[in-house]
Structures are given as C-alpha cells and as structure tokens.
Amino acid sequence: MKLCGFDVGLEQRLFLIAGPCVIESAQLQMDVAGQLREITARLGMPFIFKSSFDKANRSSGSSYRGPGRDKGLEILARVRRELALPVLTDVHTEDDIAAAAQVVDVLQTPAFLCRQTDFISAAARCGKPVNIKKGQFLAPHEMHNVIDKARAAARQAGLSEDRFMACERGASFGYNNLVSDMRSLAIMRASGAPVVFDATHSVQLPGSQGSRSGGQREMVPVLARAAVAAGVAGIFMETHPDPDRALSDGPNAVPLKHMQALLETLVALDGVTKRHGFLENRFGA
C-alpha cells in the first residue's frame, strides 16, 4: 500500500503516526511536530503527524474537546505546510469527513464507530487513506468485515480499494480496563490491510477516574515492543511534552523526551522481525 509517498506493509520499514491527542495550541503542535520530524528523519522512519480538532467521545461533557473543526484544521494545515509533513486527524461525523479531507493526508475513524456502516462507507469514499480503528468490543476477525465494507464503498465510487489500514487499540477486559492480545495482529493481517498498533490507547483505563480516563503510560514501551515483534506495518503513539498537564489522554501519553529512545528500540526490533519473516504463515503448509 502506498501512503503519503512511502510504501507500508510487512516487507517495508515501520512507520509512525504520532502527536498530541488533541490540539491545544498552534505552538504546541508546531513544537511537537518539529521535534518528531527531527527524530524520525535521523532514524529513517516514515512519519505522519496526528492530532484531533474535536474529541467527541470524552468521558465527561465538561472535558476539553479541542479548538473545533475550522480552527483545528487551520492549525493542521499550518503544520503540513510549514513543516512539510503529512498529517492525520480523526473524524466523528460525515460532515467532518468532507471538511477534513480537504486539508489532511489521512483520515482516522474512531473505534466506537467501526460498526457504523454509513460512516465507514462515507470515509472510504472521500478519496483519502483511512486508518480504521478496531472497536474495543470487537473480535479481531470481525475487522475483516469492516475492511470489506470500506473496500466495497471505494469500489462503488470508482476509487482504489488499497487505501485502508486496520488499527488495534486493545479490547475491553471487564470494567475500566483494556488488554492487548498480540494474536489479534496476525488475525487482522489476514484481511490484507496493513495493520497499525495503537500503543497508547491500548494502555488507557477508560473511565477509571470517574469523570475522565486513566492510563498506564509506563506500559506503552512494553506493548509497543511486543506489537513490533509480532509484526505490524505501523505504530501509533500519542505524545506530549508534559503529559500530566495534557488536556486529553495525558495518563497514557508518551513523554516527548522519551520518544527518541523508544523509537530507536522499535526501529531496531522491526528490522530483526521483518528480516527473519513470519514463520506462523507457514504453519498451515
């Protein structure tokens, strides 16, 4: 699959989707994007900057949601223009899809909306690559159906069917907890879509703090290493210079100062994993 000018897949180097959870200010976006650009350039790692203009699924109605669509897209356009970076943002309504597709390079659909056929189909018809997040309530093999819906919508619109990624972000494990089953990555790969692992939302503790979600950011490196060893096309991580003061998802964000060390490990591990291939693919032979 071609994505933002580079190839993605199990025979290609690991790519990164990263940035603050939500747009807090234009300066923060520029600072974080600039630092990530420098780190990934040194590592030879393809990079897509991400951030959200509206967090429509916050735990509390009083929580900060973002600057709104118009202002948020304006800031993302600035990052794209001034730093020459591809950008990704998530969309929550069909109106968002049309507006965001005019500005960003990649769209992302929320995990909670992965079963909404009309929404997934609308995203698939926008002409942009789409990172489709697996719902916390979905078995990994059910993502094949979601990818098939997107491909069918693209086909009916006369567009390429090779523009969709499947993103794992953990599965509900009782109340206020998620678990990551690394088998899901291999199962989702069978859809033929590149698989991305969301290492930060996978350590979220949804709603565990009453009016907001908690998280175990110290476990991000653990799950990220495991996912890259299992074999993925890309890794998704939210990061912030000061996670304890972040306006959204701080408890599961990677401190920006640790991103280089973590990415160095992941790039090295990805090279070993992909160089030796995937023995599991031959077990049925």
Swiss-Prot record:
Belongs to the KdsA family. The keyword Cytoplasm applies. One of its GO terms (biological process) is keto-3-deoxy-D-manno-octulosonic acid biosynthetic process. GO terms for molecular function: 3-deoxy-8-phosphooctulonate synthase activity. Pfam families: DAHP_synth_1. The keyword Cytoplasm applies. It comes from Verminephrobacter eiseniae (strain EF01-2). It catalyses: D-arabinose 5-phosphate + phosphoenolpyruvate + H2O = 3-deoxy-alpha-D-manno-2-octulosonate-8-phosphate + phosphate. It is found in: Cytoplasm. One of its GO terms (cellular component) is cytoplasm. Its EC number is 2.5.1.55. It is an enzyme of class 2 (transferase). The lineage of its organism: Bacteria, Pseudomonadati, Pseudomonadota, Betaproteobacteria, Burkholderiales. This is 2-dehydro-3-deoxyphosphooctonate aldolase. Keywords: Cytoplasm, Lipopolysaccharide biosynthesis, Transferase. InterPro entries: Aldolase_TIM (IPR013785), DAHP1/KDSA (IPR006218), KDO8P_synthase (IPR006269). Gene3D superfamilies: Aldolase class I (3.20.20.70). Pathway: Carbohydrate biosynthesis; 3-deoxy-D-manno-octulosonate biosynthesis; 3-deoxy-D-manno-octulosonate from D-ribulose 5-phosphate: step 2/3; Bacterial outer membrane biogenesis; lipopolysaccharide biosynthesis. It comes from the Bacteria.
